[in-house]
């Protein structure tokens, strides 16, 4: 469900409380971005962003969601985040943009971006039976139903699958399915569908979810660990409103490790939204 007016008000409120933080491209207040951690020539998440001293990325088994996220292609470092209509996003809070085009529809927003990355991973793995997301009313929307030619028919708050077209597991139809999910699922339904996990166990693919109408969602793109202390750091990515490409966020408050985030605070302060440390969720 889309609530552009409410989200706009939320956006204004967040930034009015950040009057001392100037958002500039590839930079922050409270210390510049740690250039030693950024390789502007890197064209994947792993190659673009290095770990801070004494940290190393946690293991990523071949074929895992972690490995998939690390290998996601990035746009050239000098390119902007694009909105769904082709305009540049004028708030620069990123150190990388995932090279994954979005459709010319104001649909793929924050929660949708997290769902898309997970769905894209499962689609590449051909694990079609695992691609399913719940609508806000709690009803499951399985990709295999859509691919088999069934379409949702609504009767009040109830939705049923009705055979309409021929079977098609092609990528365009897969994107049509995701458009349906984006329309009827969101931060609230994700918070009901996923399980909460302790931040000490944070891993790539987890989501910080603040459920609501509107709420917000960011996805954990990678995690590194200090073998001596056990301390973990993580990278975050987001979609936003209006719909935009998925961007890897900078950390405006911890310049020495920017763009990594630490788990030592109760509040996870991203540039455009604050989460609490107990709002971490995981796909089951």
Task: List PLM regions with ranges.
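Bacterial Sec-dependent N-terminal signal peptides
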Residues: 1-26
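Cationic-aromatic interfacial patches
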Residues: 20-101, 108
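Extracytoplasmic/periplasmic, Sec-exported soluble proteins
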Residues: 57, 102-110, 197-200, 212
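Extracellular-facing segments of soluble proteins and assemblies that are Gly/Ser/Thr-biased and enriched
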Residues: 103-195
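Extracellular structured ligand-interaction cores
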Residues: 107, 111, 205, 215-218, ...
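...with weaker cross-activation on analogous glycine-rich loops/strands in unrelated enzymes
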Residues: 171-228
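Low-complexity, Gly/Ser/Thr/Pro-rich intrinsically disordered linker/tail segments
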Residues: 232-284
């Amino acid at each position: 469900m889309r609530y552009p007016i409410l989200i706009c008000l939320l956006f204004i409120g967040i930034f009015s409380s950040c009057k001392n933080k100037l958002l500039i491209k590839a930079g922050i207040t409270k210390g510049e971005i740690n250039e030693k951690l950024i390789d502007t020539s890197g064209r994947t998440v792993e190659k673009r962003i290095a770990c801070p001293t004494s940290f190393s990325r946690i293991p990523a088994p071949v074929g895992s969601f972690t490995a998939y996220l690390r290998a996601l292609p990035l746009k050239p470092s000098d390119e902007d985040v694009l909105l769904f209509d082709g305009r540049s996003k004028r708030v620069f809070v990123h150190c990388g943009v995932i090279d994954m085009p979005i459709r010319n529809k104001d649909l793929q927003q924050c929660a949708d971006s997290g769902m898309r990355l997970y769905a894209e991973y499962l689609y590449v793995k051909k694990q079609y039976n695992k691609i399913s997301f719940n609508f806000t009313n709690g009803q499951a929307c399985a990709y295999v139903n859509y691919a088999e030619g069934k379409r949702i028919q609504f009767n009040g708050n109830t939705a049923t699958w009705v055979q309409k077209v021929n079977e098609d597991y092609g990528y365009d139809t897969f994107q049509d399915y995701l458009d349906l999910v984006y329309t009827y699922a969101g931060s609230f339904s994700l918070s009901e569908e996923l399980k909460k996990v302790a931040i000490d166990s944070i891993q790539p693919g987890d989501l910080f979810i603040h459920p609501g109408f509107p709420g917000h969602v960011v996805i954990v793109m990678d995690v590194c660990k200090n073998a001596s202390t056990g301390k973990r750091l993580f990278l975050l990515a987001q979609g936003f409103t209006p719909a935009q490409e998925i961007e890897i966020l900078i950390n405006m408050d911890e310049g020495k490790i920017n763009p990594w985030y630490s788990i030592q605070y109760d509040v996870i302060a991203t540039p455009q939204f604050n989460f609490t440390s107990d709002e971490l969720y995981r796909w089951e």
